[in-house]
């Protein structure tokens, strides 16, 4: 079939062949063909792109009228000599409580000596030497109370506390009361005292006391090794007596929490073991 078409085309006249097929040749275009993808305008494209530089916020400024040469609406002058501030009641009450608390602390008293019975060895030696020794002492709201140990030298005995509230310009003797001993047949007796403190005590005066034991026409004193037992204000408390190092013998042992015989032997050589504990009396 291809042969027939070629033959018919070649058998035509030259002029006929040129005129018949000339219209099939497409003319040359001066402009390129329009693409099928439509792009937006430059403005629309610019709006689609995120801005890279952030706009700076403008800071607000406040200016007063006098800076602009104008008159102020109202002028208020504050002075410390004006009327007192209107402080709320709860704040005023709080300030009063703080002041009263500070005053109470300045008027509170403390013991300016350690408890004598805290060091048992020293307490026992003082009792045997002086026949009397303060055992313990505590401060209550407006009173001082404690106990005294004395050797039972005779049946008739008197124990009293000699106390001063004005640095020994004057003093008062307060009798002690006998306390029945729990252990019968003990060679030591116990006395107690409870002394009320005065309402007003001058800050420059010292409160001191000593213990007196009268028996068989003789007097025995416990004056805390000549320093007396002092009661001072909390803010003036002397820590010298409370921080003195222990001057007793150094046994060179470490305490055993289970109470081994080596510990008891170091403290009390007369105790070879706990077998002799039953033969001992109370520590006082």
UniProtKB/Swiss-Prot annotation:
InterPro entries per record: CBM21_dom (IPR005036), CBM21_dom_sf (IPR038175), Pase-1_reg-su_3B/C/D_met (IPR017434), PP1_3B (IPR030682), PP1_regulatory_subunit_3 (IPR050782)
Gene Ontology molecular-function annotations: [phosphorylase] phosphatase activity; enzyme binding; glycogen binding; protein phosphatase 1 binding; protein phosphatase regulator activity
Residue interval(s) of motif PP1-binding motif: 61-64
Modified residues (Phosphoserine): 260
Tissues where this protein is expressed: Highly expressed in liver. Moderately expressed in kidney, heart, testis, spleen and lung. Weakly expressed in skeletal muscle (at protein level). Expressed predominantly in liver. Expressed moderately in heart. Expressed weakly in lung, kidney, spleen and skeletal muscle.
Annotated Gene Ontology cellular component terms: glycogen granule; protein phosphatase type 1 complex
GO biological process, one term: regulation of glycogen catabolic process
Record's subunit section: Interacts with glycogen, PPP1CC catalytic subunit of PP1 and PYGL. Associates with glycogen particles. Forms complexes with debranching enzyme, glycogen phosphorylase, glycogen synthase and phosphorylase kinase which is necessary for its regulation of PP1 activity.
Protein name: Protein phosphatase 1 regulatory subunit 3B
UniProt source species: Rattus norvegicus
């Amino acid at each position: 079939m291809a042969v027939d078409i070629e033959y018919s085309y070649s058998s035509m006249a030259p002029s006929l062949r040129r005129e018949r097929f000339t219209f099939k040749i497409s003319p040359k275009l001066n402009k390129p063909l329009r693409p099928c993808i439509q792009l937006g305008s430059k403005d629309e494209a610019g709006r689609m792109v995120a801005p890279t530089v952030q706009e700076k916020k403008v800071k607000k400024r406040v200016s007063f009228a006098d800076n602009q040469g104008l008159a102020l609406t109202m002028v208020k002058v504050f002075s410390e000599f004006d009327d007192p501030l209107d402080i709320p009641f709860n704040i005023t009450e709080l300030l009063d409580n703080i002041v009263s608390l500070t005053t109470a602390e300045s008027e509170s008293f403390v013991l300016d000596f350690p408890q004598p019975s805290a060091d048992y060895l020293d307490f026992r030696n003082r009792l045997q030497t002086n026949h009397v020794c303060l055992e313990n002492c505590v401060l209550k709201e407006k009173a001082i109370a404690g106990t005294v140990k004395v050797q039972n030298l005779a049946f008739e005995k008197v124990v009293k506390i000699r106390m001063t509230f004005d640095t020994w310009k004057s003093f008062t003797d307060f009798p002690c009361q006998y306390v029945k001993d729990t252990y019968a047949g003990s060679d030591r007796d116990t006395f107690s005292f409870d002394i009320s403190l005065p309402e007003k005590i001058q800050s420059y005066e010292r409160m001191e006391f000593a213990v007196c034991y009268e028996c068989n026409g003789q007097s025995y004193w416990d004056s805390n090794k000549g320093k007396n037992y002092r009661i001072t204000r909390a803010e003036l408390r002397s820590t010298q007596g409370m921080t003195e190092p222990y001057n007793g013998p150094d046994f060179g042992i470490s305490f055993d929490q289970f109470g081994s015989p080596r510990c008891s032997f170091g403290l009390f050589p007369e105790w070879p073991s706990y077998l002799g504990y039953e033969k001992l009396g109370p520590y006082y």
